[in-house]
Amino acid sequence: MSGTKAKRDLTEGPLFVPIFTFVVPIILTGMLQILYNMADNIVVGRFSGDELALAAVGSTSSLSNLIINLLMGIAGGAAVVIAQSYGAKDYEKLSRAVHTSILFSVIGGIFFCVLGLAISRPALLLMATKDELMSRALLYLRIICLGIPASAIYNFGAAVLRSVGDSKTPLFILSSTGLINVLLNLFFVIVCKMSVDGVALATIISQYVSAAVVLIILFKRKDAPYTLELPKISIDPTILKRILALGLPAGFQGTLFSISNIILTAGINQLPTTDISGKTIAINIEGLVYTAMNSYLHASTTFTGQNYGAKKPDRIKKSIFYTVLQVFIVGFVGGQIINFFGEPLASLYIDANDPNKEAVMAAALELMSFMLSCYFLCGIMDTLSGAMRGLGYSVIPMIISIGAICVLRAIWIFYVFPMEEFHSLIGIYTVYPLSWSLGLIALGISLFIVYRRIKKKLSAEDSISLSAEAVK
């Protein structure tokens, strides 16, 4: 695909359909990631012959997501800088942002890989991981940490592509490497008789292939303003400062979500192993809906970012409205569909010979039914957060996350969860819709105020520009 065809100007023309066509490849990409993750869990749950393997994998997810969320947040900062530069047609700045982003992803990925390896055991102990799960969870987590550099490179590369309107190429990459992941899962677990180490190894191999492919694509797009050129790969301090100013708050926001989830996981780990396995299954399946909704965060960031760069406030407002409308529909309808097929989907994860299969199934279905009925609230909250980032405001969503999400969830786990009536899976997860609702309201009010300021600012700049032209 040529660079010309691979870039889209989102500052002209209709919005509703282009937003949807932009989001569909991102949704499919995310769905593939979830399906491949489901394959990991299905293979380890059904074919490893180890009834504790699935619970061990599930007990590490919040911790591994913590580091990935920080890197993805910084990648989001790069996406905003690139989208705004592209909308303003400042291709020289765009190129500097791309080269800075890629080099930073390599450095950051290696740093967090080492950090993850160092804190794996103490972090699992802090999360109250059960003794019978510890050795398996630690092995899985350490192998996954080895893939962090590849994950960082891929996510920054994909952010570059999405920022210029190309959401199809990441789909192509993930569809190819995901298949590799599934085949390696089956090979390592069934043929090589491995367990959690097999699925972790399959995951990081596919991640390194993804990273290599996205770099090759960026190097080969010679006629695109975002093409990678080896001599230009360096850190531009001014660009990096802007990326970090936008990306670190977003990264910390994602990290705070992960920390709050780690706190909740510590509570969940106090429950029976069947509940932990049921939670792992439910969250895995719910991920299909979450991933579809989360795609609108990327859409709102890209569309508002490009139109902010192009100084078009009316298109910014329409972009926000259409992304919120679409994410509500996707979240509500998608939740009902997944709920309807909940039992056959959950049964894929459970070994027919597992003596605890009925208890695991009951826990999974109960949690899915509860969470999916209100998941659209999370989607709207994330979409509003993406719009704020696209407009260059990353600190406000972070502050809201600290209060509405992290503090509330911490209070819940320490003071509400110990109560007998709340000491259950549903009792602990009741805090989720409450925190989403608070976050949504706070972000909605903040975005309204920010938009009015931006519209006033852009209108004033337009007036000055017109006056200058009149003088000429």
Which residues fall in each region the model found?
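N-terminal transmembrane alpha-helices
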Residues: L10-I42, R46-F47, S62-G77, V81, ...
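Small-residue hotspots at the loop-to-helix junctions and early N-terminal turns
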Residues: E51-S62, L141, A200, T273-L288, ...
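Short runs within selected transmembrane alpha-helices of multi-pass transporters and secretion channels
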Residues: A75, I144-R162, P170-G178, V199-V214, ...
